[in-house]
Amino acid sequence: MKSIFNLFTITCFIFISIFCASISFAQSSEGIEEIVVTARKKEENIQETALSVSALSARDIENRFPTDIRDLAGESPNLIIDDLQQGPGSPTAIFIRGVGVSDVEKNFDPTTGVVLDGVFVGANSGAMLKTIDLESVEILRGPQGTLFGRNTVAGVINLTRSKPTGEVGGKLKVGYGDYDTTIIDGILNFGTPDAAFKITGTLREQAEGYLTNLVDNKDLGREEYSQITFNSLFAVNDNMEVELTLTDEQQDQDAHTALNLGGATTWWCAVYGQCSPGLGIPQSGDRYKVYNNEPKRRDASFESFTGILEVRWQLSEKYKLDYILGRKTTDEVVDQDWDGTPLTLYHTDRNAEYEQTSHEIRITSDLEGPLNYVVGLYKWDSEYTIPMESRIGFFDLFGAVPTQDPLIVVPIYNYTHQETDSIAVFFEADYDINEQITLTVGGRYIDEEKSSNACQGPGPYPDCSAINTYADKTWTKFTPKVAVSYQANEDLLYYLSYSQGYRSGGFNGRWGNEFSAVRPYKPETVTNIEAGLKSTLLDNRLRFNLAIFDMEYEDKQLDVDIPDTLAAIGRATVTDNVAEASFKGVELELYAIINQNFSVDLNVGYLDASYDEFFADFTGSGTPADFTYLEPLRAPDLTWTLGLTYEWEAGPGLAYVRASAHHIGEHHTSQLNSPTTFNKEQTLVDLSMNYELNNTVFAFFAKNITEEDGFTVGYDVFAGAAWTYAMARKPRTWGISITQTF
């Protein structure tokens, strides 16, 4: 009832806003600029694209002062982007319409495709991309399996960087913020129109942490990030251009520290006296105060290299060929305290190496007849290696050590290596039945193989040849799409679509013994039926879009416990396909130019998420129980963002002020819906101001002014029997900057 009331209230507000706006629109002389998107692998007006997509231009992005894509979560309905804080490289939890994954392990494939310059980022670590030198951002909601492929069951975040201009020029930005934060961004363009070059450099250093470690009374949470990008663009002839982009990134930071939320019945409290004082309150009493008895300053590191080669060839007036080669490698090191206490109960030293290579070739038609299409071939290879040391201080509970002494720590060394090879063919065709009705049909066939090799031993690199722990598995899948759109007039589009997405199966990357590491789990699929309209009203001064969707989730992959006689505690956590779920909802987007100075943007997402079937074992008893009553993770029934922008001429320059409020409804962050990690409603308020004088911009920004401290991650270890940990979002931040264009 509360959700229905909230939706009714927001809907009334929207139509009141439209009515009020229509009264004053006559004072404005400028209309809304056309937004061009590439959501369907070709350039289209966003209002003529028959799918749910939100988009930001370069100017929109700059005026919001985002650090990374997390700061853009409010730009789309039904979108949550959280930093999992479970390692360097900002492992990311992206949930669109309640569909997502929140885990750092690389065997957990993404549900949302983060795509940079046409290249898919294949792991959650490194997916929290920095918003540097971006030309556009597109957020596609719903399965995008046809054109973007596997692991896009929730949607796609498509980012495109600016191209070299071929002229000498550039931009330098220098900024400073609280927590002793320094920002330096630079862009240099040079060359000629036929051989254009661009160098982008970035240094962002937060020298003071926002956390206090109660063990040594020093700060934690510091971070330093640097990036250098070289971009070249060559015009081979009038019909072909080749672009090469090389990016090197380095991130050094304090390892994140978990908060202990274990209550009276948990092992942490009952046995070791490490207790939470109340529901949702950490042991420290404050979400920004932690216990870390092995603090190491900036010892967590993430190194990344990305190379992208793209060939764009206009074969003729009717056909265009695109080829994209993407190569990405990462190397991460982190020693992390997970128990959230002054003791060493569970710490990990977790290093990981990852690499991916992708090839995509596609042909796009531009025919004069009723039929046009995109057809292509895609190849993907990736692998990762993790040698991990777990330092466990609670084995005494299972008779593994002679006494209940938290000073006795048992090291366990796990080695995991997994590989993925995938190939796919895809197509999507539009057929104009008449001048108003278009039928779209598409599909993608995927053939994928994964392998896993794992073992334990007395040292960090045990000999896996001593035991047969290798396994591989092959899956195939066809994901279809059918849509029909009706262009009622040049300002109004209706559409109805059916699409399907596929998320890969795999092998457990987090395991208790070698044999659970080679136990496969199946792929999962999401099927979406969606109806929508896109409208441009009031003489091109109001854009209003609406979508209604019904998504069915099959073979949902979740972590469960199984009996395991080989494990020291008699149980093991594995990934299995244990649930079916439904996600239904409504999405509204509105942008209005009130007059030549004032504009309003609003998006609203209503979501009804539930499990249809959920039978699993979370106690290691061997008998699954019915958990259908639980709510899916990060699936608030209501999200909305309201932005107000005012621009005016102030003296010799141009002033700009934007204020926004981003509301996230109450939701769970732990799979078992622990009330300890439950997030109440949050409303994050941001403010940005700038003054542009000739080629210089002076700016101020503030984020999370309301200091919302909701949890970005929550986990019940052994179904909450051992302890529950969580980590909170960053507090309020502010900064100033000067940008000079030359």
What do the PLM-derived regions correspond to, one by one?
Residues F190, I308-Q336, Q487, L493-R503, ...:
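Membrane-embedded beta-barrel scaffold of Gram-negative outer-membrane proteins
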Residues L233-N237, I363-D366, N372, G376-W380, ...:
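Structural signature of Gram-negative outer-membrane beta-barrels, strongest in the C-terminal barrel
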Residues Y210-D219, H256-N293, W338-T348, E389-Y415, ...:
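Solvent-exposed loop segments that connect transmembrane elements
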Residues H662-S670, N690-F742:
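C-terminal beta-signal and adjacent terminal beta-strands/loops
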Residues G169-K171, Y176-Q206, L211, V215-T257, ...:
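Transmembrane beta-barrel wall of Gram-negative outer-membrane proteins
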Residues M1-P66, R70-G74, D238, Q274, ...:
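N-terminal Sec signal peptide and the immediately downstream disordered periplasmic leader
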Residues G31-E167, A531:
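Acidic, small-polar-rich N-terminal luminal/periplasmic segments of exported/outer-membrane proteins
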Residues Y373-V374, E435-L439, D550-E552, D576-Q671, ...:
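Gram-negative outer-membrane beta-barrel transporters
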